């Protein structure tokens, strides 16, 4: 048996706001979207490289305010990329975490947080 990486489900309230944040700003792509019928809440999968997230407008799927920890090998490159795309609500910086890593944290319009983490060499 082989376990695969988990796929976090994040609560969203507006598909257009979610797309603006995850696709237009963070650089994810929409892999697919599902609605049980026209006008029903959306459930979609977004991905960037190996990172896959599910975004749900469905009440009861999950609660807003989740935090997802994403490993990366170059937080500074991500910071430059995000800084090149205007976002009036987010201007994240790069910090050094107590666990000896460079981190960049962003918060989506629904209160969910993504923490991008780059471990630093041991001192």
Model-derived segments and their meaning:
Residues 9, 43, 52, 103-105:
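Short hydrophobic/aromatic beta-strand element in the GNAT-like acyltransferase core
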Residues 9-11, 29-37, 95, 121-123:
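Conserved catalytic-core motifs of GNAT/GCN5-like acyltransferases
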Residues 21, 25-26, 109:
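Structural motif
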Residues 24-30, 86-88:
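Conserved acetyl-CoA-binding loop of GNAT-fold acetyltransferases
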Residues 61, 98, 119-123:
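A short acidic/small-residue loop/turn micro-motif
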